[in-house]
From Swiss-Prot:
One of its GO terms (biological process) is 'de novo' IMP biosynthetic process. HAMAP family: PurT. This is Formate-dependent phosphoribosylglycinamide formyltransferase. N(1)-(5-phospho-beta-D-ribosyl)glycinamide binds at E26, L27, E86, D295, K375, R382, R383. The keyword Lipid biosynthesis does not apply. ATP binds at R118, K159, E199, E200, H201, I202, E207. The gene is purT. It catalyses: N(1)-(5-phospho-beta-D-ribosyl)glycinamide + formate + ATP = N(2)-formyl-N(1)-(5-phospho-beta-D-ribosyl)glycinamide + ADP + phosphate + H(+).
Length: 429
């Protein structure tokens, strides 16, 4: 692991600090932009050319990140100061080997290994971190899945043991849904579905993400700093809108910090963790953990001061730089600048060379802006952009973000124009 840092070099010179992004989506793009602002050299890797982060990196490589030899060829050539996984589909053996050879994997290889596998993560949350979660069971056959769902009770959730972005998950309302849940896990998981986890349904008030960041303080000690919890909702298992602050009780907020601290202390390392939780009244349950910036955390591009979005916080931690904070009742808190919200811009069709219109109207709305990710290909449900909005009232920010997102239309080379109004579930307007 790196040491506390007081100096930085200059990109593309022999004094440069280098970061290697394994995954080059919209989250990696924002990390790269923050790195550019500090003169850090950026190398971006992904499975396809011209991925978002590649468009703002110094160099890029295209290849299969499940291929250990490919990853080693890049690492040996670039010799990065930090290797930053941005996605789940990465060869884990390679990450452990990089650490063994003295490379800094963010936050560490073990945390990545745990977080991307739901059984390892759930056992870590319950047995090591000792934090509350929903009840759960595992199934490896269809008969076991019927039995597990019956014991957990309906409704419940089934999820492939290794996946991301809600792929391979299903909301099971009764026994008649189980064959579909089995098929969903086996055919759509982004990873492995040799085992399926069945989770109790929590009738929560709000789903939140705590963006806990482990970093060196001004004295060179590792501390954890907590921004305000981010509220969000999902549609079909994928993030659709987020806002900060999350509008939860003071007691629940302190429990969020307590749970996030226990989890990140167990996982260790340096960097930002997106810790997903359910909140109902004053009760909080841990759900999942992402050992990297979180899609719901894009709201911090508006709600936090410049340079201190979740991406800026992650980069500071990775580089060994301090992050300001204030101790309040035993927790180190990061101040929010203004309440803000996000709303996604998603594709309804498949095709290349996406185009967007309605921007003149959208960009005329005060206290809102549009971020387009620059993805060269669209497919149904793919996130191609996001709207950021801010207001002294977080409810107004949520409405504004939603309103502006629904002003945007998009098309591809092979499709007609379509708007965002095809999806209105959970919307405010």
């Amino acid at each position: 692991m790196i040491e506390p840092r007081d100096e930085l070099g200059t990109a593309t010179t022999d004094s440069a600090q280098k970061i290697l992004l394994l995954g080059s989506g919209e989250l990696g793009k924002e990390i790269a932009i923050e790195a550019q602002r500090l003169g850090v050299e950026v190398i971006a890797v992904d499975r396809y050319a011209n991925a978002p982060a590649m468009q703002v990196a110094h160099r890029s490589y295209v290849g299969n990140m499940m291929d250990k030899d490919f990853l080693w060829s890049v690492v040996e050539r670039e010799k990065p100061d930090a290797i930053i996984p941005e996605i789940e589909a990465i060869n884990l053996d390679a990450l452990f080997e990089f650490e063994k050879e003295g490379y800094f994997v963010v936050p560490n290889a073990r945390a990545t290994w745990i977080a991307m596998h739901r059984e390892r993560l759930r056992e870590t949350l319950v047995k090591e971190a000792k934090v509350p979660t929903s009840r759960y069971m595992y199934a490896t056959t269809l008969d076991e899945l019927y039995e597990a769902c019956e014991k957990i009770g309906y409704p419940c959730h089934t999820k492939a043991i290794m996946s991301s972005s809600g792929k391979g998950s299903y909301f099971v309302k009764g026994p008649e849904d189980i064959p579909k849940a089995w098929e969903e896990a086996k055919t759509k998981a982004r990873g492995s579905a040799e085992k399926i986890i069945v989770e109790e349904h929590i009738d929560f008030d709000v789903e939140i993400t705590e963006l806990a960041v482990r970093h060196f303080d001004e004295n060179g000690e590792i501390v954890t700093t907590f921004p305000k919890p981010v509220g969000h909702y999902q549609i079909d298992g994928d993030y659709h809108a987020s806002w900060q602050p999350a509008e939860i009780s003071e007691k629940a907020e302190r429990e969020v910090y307590r749970i996030a601290k226990r989890i990140t202390d167990v996982l260790g390392g340096l960097g930002l963790f997106g810790v997903e939780m359910f909140v109902k009244g004053d009760k909080v349950w841990a759900n999942e953990v992402s050992p990297r910036p979180h899609d719901t955390g894009m709201v911090t591009l508006a709600s936090h001061p410049p340079g201190f979005s979740e991406f800026g916080l992650h980069l500071r931690a990775v580089l060994g730089l301090p992050i300001p904070g204030e101790w309040v009742d035993g927790y180190r808190l990061f101040p929010m600048l203004i309440p803000a919200a996000t709303h996604v811009i998603k594709a309804k069709v498949k095709g290349y060379s996406p185009r967007f219109r309605g921007l003149a109207k959208a960009l005329s709305v005060p206290n809102a802006t549009v971020r387009l990710f620059g993805k060269p290909e669209a497919y149904v449900g793919r996130r191609l952009g996001v709207v950021l909005a801010w207001d002294k009232d977080v409810q107004e920010a949520k409405k504004r973000a939603e309103m502006v997102a629904h002003m945007i239309e998009l098309r591809t080379r092979s499709s007609d124009w379509h708007d965002q109004n095809y999806e209105k579930r959970k919307h405010l307007l």
